Amino acid sequence: MTCKIIGSGGYLPQKIISNDELTKFVDTNDKWIRTRTGIFQRHIAGDTEYTSHLALKSAQKAIEDAMISVDDIDLIITCTTTPDNSFPSVATKLHGYLGLTNIPSFDLQAVCAGFIYGLQLTNSLIVSGKYKTILLIGAEKMTSLLDWNDRSTCVLFGDGAGSVILQRSNDESGLIDSNIFSSGTDYEILYTSGGTSMNGTSGKIVMQGQKLFRHAIAKMLQSIEDLLHANQFSVSDIDYFIPHQANIRIINKLAELLNIEEHKVVKTVEKHANCSAASIPLALSTLKESGKIKKGDILLFSAIGAGLTWGSALIRW
């Protein structure tokens, strides 16, 4: 028994900032950014457009795609690092926006690996029989954490949200397996300079890019290889590889080491930038809207985020 995705939806804010526009207020250029990241634009939420608003718009699309009623949802989980408020949770605010009554809702914080963590948790809750229909969201306003004078970080991130509706599977489709990990001793590789109990501010993103690159390759590769081996899958069985959209060099290096064919690798980082927990569900929504994905396809997700947190998931569509 497992859970399956019956609907998906993504949302990106209307405002787009190109690499050339960034050069107006930070010492960088389009070639430098593209060469090192693969990014040439990012979507930016407005001053009064919060993470909960992004989450709502993606959730509405997923609900419509799943062809269910809002009232069918019996749990909301929002994966986010950038909540509107310290409390209440984004999920609880979304609960109110959707007009739901008394069902549980909460946020999950595993940064860029949040959606993988959320998938594993959602599967356990549905398999337990306690919940039938879960709305799982990755939503981020990462630009609220940026120091726009730091070219090593401000060029990397964007805002957006992706949602999926999951229910129990009655056939072979659904989550095959997943794994998740963390390493708290590596937290200084990627973190924010503030926090509610530390200094009462959200702080700004601080990153050791070279170290993060090495950890990302090693940890995601091991996670993927372990997952494939545990479930007796080979790389050739994968129809689509949807990695966390952090950096084109990480994506390309993983594909090379795994020997995954180019046409199987889903890449949205060039237009979306790094949307943290939203990146995988956004990429999934983009793939689904392209019409390429078909029933029975095997999808491989993998992500790494601050913490460090990381993991992978195998899904049969």
Curated annotation (Swiss-Prot):
Q: Name one GO biological process term.
A: fatty acid biosynthetic process
What are the start and end residues of every segment in region (ACP-binding)?
245-249
Q: Taking the first listed entry, what is the main subcellular location of this protein, grouped into a coarse class?
A: cytoplasm
What reaction gets catalysed by this protein?
malonyl-[ACP] + acetyl-CoA + H(+) = 3-oxobutanoyl-[ACP] + CO2 + CoA
InterPro entries named among the record's database cross-references: ACP_syn_III_C, ACP_syn_III_N, FabH, Thiolase-like
Subcellular location, record wording = Cytoplasm
Q: Which GO terms describe its cellular component?
A: cytoplasm
Tell me the domain of life: Bacteria
A GO molecular function term, named singly, is: beta-ketoacyl-acyl-carrier-protein synthase III activity
Q: Which Pfam families match?
A: ACP_syn_III, ACP_syn_III_C
Please give the positions of the paired cysteines in each disulfide bond: none
Which pathway is it part of?
Answer: Lipid metabolism; fatty acid biosynthesis
Catalytic residues (positions) = 112, 244, 274
Q: Which UniProt keywords apply?
A: Acyltransferase, Cytoplasm, Fatty acid biosynthesis, Fatty acid metabolism, Lipid biosynthesis, Lipid metabolism, Multifunctional enzyme, Transferase
Keyword Iron-sulfur among UniProt keywords: no
Give its E.C. classification number: 2.3.1.180
| EC top class named in words | transferase
HAMAP family of this UniProt entry?
Answer: FabH
| Entry's free-text remark on domains | The last Arg residue of the ACP-binding site is essential for the weak association between ACP/AcpP and FabH.
Q: How does it assemble?
A: Homodimer.
To which protein family does this belong? Belongs to the thiolase-like superfamily. FabH family.
Q: What does the UniProt record say this protein does?
A: Catalyzes the condensation reaction of fatty acid synthesis by the addition to an acyl acceptor of two carbons from malonyl-ACP. Catalyzes the first condensation reaction which initiates fatty acid synthesis and may therefore play a role in governing the total rate of fatty acid production. Possesses both acetoacetyl-ACP synthase and acetyl transacylase activities. Its substrate specificity determines the biosynthesis of branched-chain and/or straight-chain of fatty acids.
Q: What is this protein called?
A: Beta-ketoacyl-[acyl-carrier-protein] synthase III
Q: Taxonomic lineage per UniProt?
A: Bacteria, Pseudomonadati, Pseudomonadota, Alphaproteobacteria, Rickettsiales
Q: Which gene encodes it?
A: fabH
